[in-house]
Amino acid sequence: MFELDKDTFETEVLQGTGYVLVDFWSEGCEPCKALMPDIQEMEKTYGEQVRFTKLDTTKARRLAIKEKVLGLPTIAIYKDGQKIDELTKEDATAANVEAMVKKYI
């Protein structure tokens, strides 16, 4: 998974082409850390069609607010720089994330 920061988010996600999944997480978020291995497994299956990335929101608070990330974990899918779907908090389960990814490939 490509580790985003406030400097690379613009080029990798907002100016990117195709589908990009962003895992918004933080070190203090236990559900985020529990979900991460599942997301990494999905990358092995769907990584050809969707670019998998993650952003530690504690290092990019303003960016998270700008992207309307109101709770963690938030898993968002962008297409050609536009956010097209997201799952937040309790909805961000491995099964729901995989279903969301499959919807767009």
From Swiss-Prot:
**Classification via CDD domains:** TRX_family
Which family does the similarity line name?
Belongs to the thioredoxin family.
The record, for NCBIfam families, names: ThioredTrxAClost
What is the disulfide pattern of this chain?
29-32
- Transmembrane ranges, per UniProt, are none
* UniProt-recorded name of the protein: Thioredoxin
Give the source lineage, highest ranks first. Bacteria, Bacillati, Bacillota, Clostridia, Peptostreptococcales
Domain (Thioredoxin): give its ranges: 1-105
Extract the PANTHER family matched here: GEO12009P1 (PTHR45663:SF11)
Functional note = Participates in various redox reactions through the reversible oxidation of its active center dithiol to a disulfide and catalyzes dithiol-disulfide exchange reactions.
Q: Gene Ontology cellular component?
A: cytoplasm
Lineage: superkingdom: Bacteria
Against PROSITE patterns, the record matches this protein to: THIOREDOXIN_1 (PS00194), THIOREDOXIN_2 (PS51352)
What InterPro entries has UniProt attached to this entry? Thioredoxin, Thioredoxin-like_sf, Thioredoxin_CS, Thioredoxin_domain
GO function terms (MF aspect): protein-disulfide reductase activity
Give the record's keywords alphabetically.
Disulfide bond, Electron transport, Redox-active center, Transport
